[in-house]
Design a protein with these regions (language model features):
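Beta-strand elements of modular eukaryotic interaction domains
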Residues: 135-136, 180
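A short, N-terminal "cap"/entry segment at the start of jelly-roll beta-barrel domains
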Residues: 44-135
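Sequence termini and other peripheral, non-core segments
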Residues: 135, 165-166, 192-195
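A short beta-strand-loop-beta hairpin characteristic of the jelly-roll/cupin
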Residues: 2, 9, 138-165, 175
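Intrinsically disordered, low-complexity segments enriched in Gly and acidic/Ser/Thr residues
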Residues: 115-126, 138-144, 151, 187-189
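Conserved hydrophobic/aromatic beta-strand scaffold that supports enzyme active sites
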Residues: 18, 124-126, 144, 160, ...
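Tight coil/turn sites that cap or link beta-strands
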Residues: 1, 129-132, 165-168, 172-176
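Double-stranded beta-helix
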Residues: 3-80, 178-203
């Protein structure tokens, strides 16, 4: 694993989507020493249970829960330090590239044969107005829908729901449903589909 941080550097509302590979997703989050130290400077204590406690609000570590241990230098040395050239070509998919590639059918963003070739226990597709179809579909595993542009109508036997950008919908396994834009204009949506890939190395 590598350490990474996230910051909204624009002026508009920002949202981050994190997808974990099911119940065997790698053993949880490992915190960089700087994160633990910065939290303490602001009166925050990170517990070994992964929860944050705010001393300014009178919170403290529960009985039996110690502070998150600070990672030692020998453990830090095992973490790779990737360059921009390591990361961008193999691990970044740009919105407008995905938008263009999904003009007639959904583009597989993360998957064995995706733009980002990986098998983390799920696949991610990107769907736009041009690649959306009214035909019903279902999946063996649960899926998740997250619009990023436009409003989308999700219909199934007995109901429907309209999703706006930033909304999230969990679709049960084996549920026949359709995914179509609900209004005119630009429309784009992420579809995350679980699969049977085991946890562990990608290949």
């Amino acid at each position: 694993g590598i350490f990474r941080g996230f910051e909204n550097i624009g002026t508009e509302y920002g949202m981050i989507m994190a997808i974990l590979g099911g119940d065997d997703a790698g053993g949880g989050v490992h915190w960089a020493p700087q994160v633990v130290e910065d939290a303490a400077d602001h009166g925050l204590i990170l517990g070994e249970n992964g929860k944050l406690y705010d001393q300014k609000k009178g919170q403290s570590l529960p009985d039996g829960i110690g502070p998150m241990p600070v990672m030692q230098s020998d453990e830090l040395a095992k973490r790779p330090e990737l360059t921009t050239m390591d990361v961008v070509p193999n691990h970044v998919a740009r919105f407008w590239d995905m938008f263009a590639l999904s003009d007639s059918r959904p583009v597989n963003v993360i998957g064995e044969n995706g733009l980002l070739r990986d098998k983390p226990g799920f696949e991610v597709d990107f769907i736009t107005r041009g690649s959306a179809v009214e035909n019903l579909e279902s999946h063996r595993f649960p899926s998740v829908l997250m619009p990023v542009r436009g409003h989308w109508r999700i219909s199934w036997d007995g109901g429907s729901e309209v999703l706006a950008p930033g909304d999230t919908m969990s679709v049960p396994a084996e549920l026949n449903h359709s995914i179509t834009p609900a209004v005119t204009g630009e429309a784009a949506l992420y579809q995350i589909k679980g699969n049977a890939d085991p946890a562990g190395h990608t290949w």
